[in-house]
Amino acid sequence: MAVRVLVVDDSVLYRRVLTDALKSLPDVEVVGSAASGSSVLPKFRELKPDLITLDIEMPGMSGIEVMEALRREALEVKVLVVSALTVSGGALTLKALERGAFDFITKPSEGSAQENFRCICDELAPRLRAIARRLEVQTILRRGTPPAASVAKTAAVSTPAPLLRRAPIAASAAASNNHQPELVVIGVSTGGPNALQTIFSALPGDLAAPIVIVQHMPPIFTKLLAGNLAAHSKLPVREAAHNEALSPGTAYIAPGGKQMRVVPALNGRRLLQLSDDPPENCCRPAVDYLFRSVANHFPGKALAVILTGMGEDGTAGLRLLKRGGSMVIAQDEASCVVFGMPKAAIEAGVVDLVLPLEAIADRITALVRGSQS
């Protein structure tokens, strides 16, 4: 089943680049394009796309206004924001994500035409695969009882029932080590800004542990995300700085384009270190890079949380954290935008608790305070 895509961009060049990139991907059909926001609704009604790639900064009717119009009309379509790597582009992109955009990609600002084309293809490919999987599941659900082959396929992406049944036992076993978490580490990708906002708006201001976060995002965007989260949280939230000492009750977000690790320092302090080390799992910052540092230097002292996102980043690091006695929480499938990173961790057997997004903040608070309730 091909994903039907409508390309919206006021730039003739980018309409052509995006169209060519999408056409190079399997199971994708570009059904049309639009040069302005005002033409999106008529084009949508005519072409019935599954996905709109939406330039967020357009003259006249902006990308944000397009999203608001789609929401007012209750039109069912995924939106993939296409943004410039600028402060204004980042701020508008975060607004679009708050309004329900599926995800975003950035327009390359450097490199040759061929390199930029390949970069766009690489960014589009996993997102289109994730959208295709969601559309397939939605189609199956609309049909009611799926055929046997479809049941097998959807079962493969569901949270394993045996894991859910044994989760309280696993949680008790982790707690019996008497390792009240001194540090919370979070890994997240697609759907992350809204997921993090849900969690941080519910955390208390007196949480006695620092929180260290890797969110897959480019430079500029992570600093804006930290500001947005701080506005919705009782805790201070900021973009991490090199050699910054961790403070209880403060959250730190890895800067886009940097790897981040936690290392021990004098007097029992913990420092954040940033580097230009190579990407892992095609990501910088990478969740595995952070989790591995915590597992190596602070075994059994962390609570790890893996949230919505594409791919498997975080699973290898969680395996090390579990081996050292740390506890792991994964977001459940129903509340994920993309059930990729949590699914990989669950299937690897490195998760103690699978929880809906709305329950994660309370569980973090209880564990840090030394309560299992």
What is each of the regions a protein language model found here?
Residues 1-6, 12-23, 27, 38-39, ...:
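Conserved acid/base catalytic micro-environments in cytosolic active-site loops
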Residues 35:
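Conserved residues in the N-terminal Rossmann fold of short-chain dehydrogenase/reductase
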